Structures are given as structure tokens and as C-alpha cells.
């Protein structure tokens, strides 16, 4: 089944201030010699929750798209973090805060750091089945507090950061997006489920033992070489399926991952080295928001590629999506300064 392309009508981000993760580790007594991850990571403050960061990102995306919240038919929340446990809904809270109508449906989805790409695919199909219109894909993570910066064994996770990003998308709605989403392809590695996990709070271990931090996230049981091999195989398979499905020749990659080395592995596997938009140097690894923060930067930098790949993954699934430029449309006036700014200011899109 071939769907009409999904217009990327607007993209907005909301990012807390970055911190130096090496300084945090040093202050907690961990050695930083040989650390290979991102140096900076955005860390949220008291008012930075998935719903509050998410609605700020969505409001900026709506302004960028010149669309009102009342026009949204679907809001997908694609983060793993939540203000409260289920069945409390982050997407529905974002709808309430943004002023969406009762005709809008809120859905919370989860696929780790891959969820924004799966969200774009889901929104595409949902809008097609429901006659078109506008939807929002919102990703927000607040997970820096789950990382032990004093544990050298967790150094691969030190750069986990907090933040949010949102895309307003449209199908057959006369949107004026510069890029159009054609679709995505995915490959899974289910044996890697749980490679990064929080041990406590679920039904298997609802309460942590005395003296144990119940929120602590850790890496479990895989060597780096195993993980890199899985990433190479997963991305290669997903990308081959994408290229077989769509004839466009991609010339740019938007991707951010847990470390510069992992981004390099992905870009080389996709043969898009030196043609990659990366944001980890400023933000760290944000999970679901990464791909939209990168897309916002790509749009701000006004590249002229005809086809762009979005790449994202969790440890257990890998995906690539394809965006193509719509050259038939007149460019709109600039909406404001770049959204991924130097340290020292709250980062977002100023309409």
C-alpha cells in the first residue's frame, strides 16, 4: 500500500541547560580518562517533566507550522519517561496543556530511543485511515537522574540527557512543509531487550531492597563488540529495506546516539559519513527526541538535499526513515534563530 507523503509541517524543541558530564563524574570520584561519550548533556530542572517539556516543544512546533492545537486530530507521545506511572497519560496531559479539542486522540507509545521514528510511521498510517489532517508526534525524556555518574561501569550512560522535541505533521491538508516523510523500515533484535534497564518498579521487582536506588539505570550483560555488531547488522538490514522500497538516493543523515563512536558506526554503515547532522556535542543522548532535535537543526541550517535519512534505534530494534524535499513549494520566511544554540540559554524555537 502506497500512502501520500506525510508533510513535516513544523518542528519544535525544548532543551534544558547542558552540564559537563566529566565534571559530574569527577565530583563523584569516578575516573574520566578514556571516556568516549558526549561531553555535554542537558539536565532538567525542577519544572522539567515529560509533559511540561513536551508541551513547550509542541507549542513551538505548532507556531512553526502555523497550525493551532485545535486542528490536531492525534497526539502521539513517544517517550519512555512519564510524570506519573500509567494509566496516567502524557499525551493526554500535553493535549490539555496545549488546548487540543475533545476530537483529538492522545496515545502513549514506547519503543525506547526508536519511538519517534515509529511514531512518524504510526501517525502516517493513522491519518491515512482517518481521512487526513494534522497530528503531533512528541518525544520527551527526563532520565538523567537515573544515571550513576560515579559508577565507571555506567560510563556509557553518562551522557543521557533530558529534553523534548515535537513535530506537527499533515496528510492531504495543504501544509507548507519543506520535507515530506515517505515511510520507514525496521529490524528487531529481541534477544537484546533489557540490555539497558531499571531493575525495580515493575511487576517482577516492584520494590528495591533497602539502601538501593530504585531509579538506577544500568547496562546488563553484553560486550561492546557484540552491541556494535548488532547495530551494524540492524541498521544495514533496515536501510536495505528502505532503499528497496523507495527509489530516492539519500545524501544526508540525521542521527544522534549514545556516543560519537556509535554515530560513526551508523553513518559508515549507511555510507553517509561526513554528511550527518549530529546534536550530541551540545545535548548528549536524549533518546526519542534526538531525531527531531537533529531535524530542527537540519532545517535551520538550510541544506538543499533532495533526500534525507532519519536513523534511530533502541538496543533491541533499529530503524531508518526517508524524507524528501518538496521543491514545488515556496520557502517560508525564517521562523527565528536556530533551535540548538550555544550553552547559556534555554533552547527552543522562537516563532
What are the functions of these language-model segments?
Residues 2-6, 70-73, 101-104, 129-135, ...:
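Short coil/turn connectors at secondary-structure junctions
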Residues 28-33, 85-99, 137-146, 261-272:
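Acidic-glycine-rich active-site phosphate/pyrophosphate-binding loop
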Residues 124, 128-163:
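Flexible, glycine-rich active-site loops centered on histidine and acidic residues
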Residues 55, 81-83, 87-88, 101, ...:
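Claisen-condensing/thiolase-fold acyl-transfer catalytic domains that form or cleave C-C bonds
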Residues 1-50, 153-229, 326-351:
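Condensing-enzyme catalytic core mediating Claisen C-C bond formation in acyl metabolism
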Residues 110, 135-141, 169, 309-313:
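Short beta-strand segments
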Residues 35-41, 74-76, 96-109, 146-151, ...:
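Glycine/charged-rich beta-loop-alpha catalytic/anionic-binding loops adjacent to active sites
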Residues 8, 48-111, 117, 245-263:
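Conserved beta-ketoacyl condensing-enzyme motif
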Amino acid at each position: 500500500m502506497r500512502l501520500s507523503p506525510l508533510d513535516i509541517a513544523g518542528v519544535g524543541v525544548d532543551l534544558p541547560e547542558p552540564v559537563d558530564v566529566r565534571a559530574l563524574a569527577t565530583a563523584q570520584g569516578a575516573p574520566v580518562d578514556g571516556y568516549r561519550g558526549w561531553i555535554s548533556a542537558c539536565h532538567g530542572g525542577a519544572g522539567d517533566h515529560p509533559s511540561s517539556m513536551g508541551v513547550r516543544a509542541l507549542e513551538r512546533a505548532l507556531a512553526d507550522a502555523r497550525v493551532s492545537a485545535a486542528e490536531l486530530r492525534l497526539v502521539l507521545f513517544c517517550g519512555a519517561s512519564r510524570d506519573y506511572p500509567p494509566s496516567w497519560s502524557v499525551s493526554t496531559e500535553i493535549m490539555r496543556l496545549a488546548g487540543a479539542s475533545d476530537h483529538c486522540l492522545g496515545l502513549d507509545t514506547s519503543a525506547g530511543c526508536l519511538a519517534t521514528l515509529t511514531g512518524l510511521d504510526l501517525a502516517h498510517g493513522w491519518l491515512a485511515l482517518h481521512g487526513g489532517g494534522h497530528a503531533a508526534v512528541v518525544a520527551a525524556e527526563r532520565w538523567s537522574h537515573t544515571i550513576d555518574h560515579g559508577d565507571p561501569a555506567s560510563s556509557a550512560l553518562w551522557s543521557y540527557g533530558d529534553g523534548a522535541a515535537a513535530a506537527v505533521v499533515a496528510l492531504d491538508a495543504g501544509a507548507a512543509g519543506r520535507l515530506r516523510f515517505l515511510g520507514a523500515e525496521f529490524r528487531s533484535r529481541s534477544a537484546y531487550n533489557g540490555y539497558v534497564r531499571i531493575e525495580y518498579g515493575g511487576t517482577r521487582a516492584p520494590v528495591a531492597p533497602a539502601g538501593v536506588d530504585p531509579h538506577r539505570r544500568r547496562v546488563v550483560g553484553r560486550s561492546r563488540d557484540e552491541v556494535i555488531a548488532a547495530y551494524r547488522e540492524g541498521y544495514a538490514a533496515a536501510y536495505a529495506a528502505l532503499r528497496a522500497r523507495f527509489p530516492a538516493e539519500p545524501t544526508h543523515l540525521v542521527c544522534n546516539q549514545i556516543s560519537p563512536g556509535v554515530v560513526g558506526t551508523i553513518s559508515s554503515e549507511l555510507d553517509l559519513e561526513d554528511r550527518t547532522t549530529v546534536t550530541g556535542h551540545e545535548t548528549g543522548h536524549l533518546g526519542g527526541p534526538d531525531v527531531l532535535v537533529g531535524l530542527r537543526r537540519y532545517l535551520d541550517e538550510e541544506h538543499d538535499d533532495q533526500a534525507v535519512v532519519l536513523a534511530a534505534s533502541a538496543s533491541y530494534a533499529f530503524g531508518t526513515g526517508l524524507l524528501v524535499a518538496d521543491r514545488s513549494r515556496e520557502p517560508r520566511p525564517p521562523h527565528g534563530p536556530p533551535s540548538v544554540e550555544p550553552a547559556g540559554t534555554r533552547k527552543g524555537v522562537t516563532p
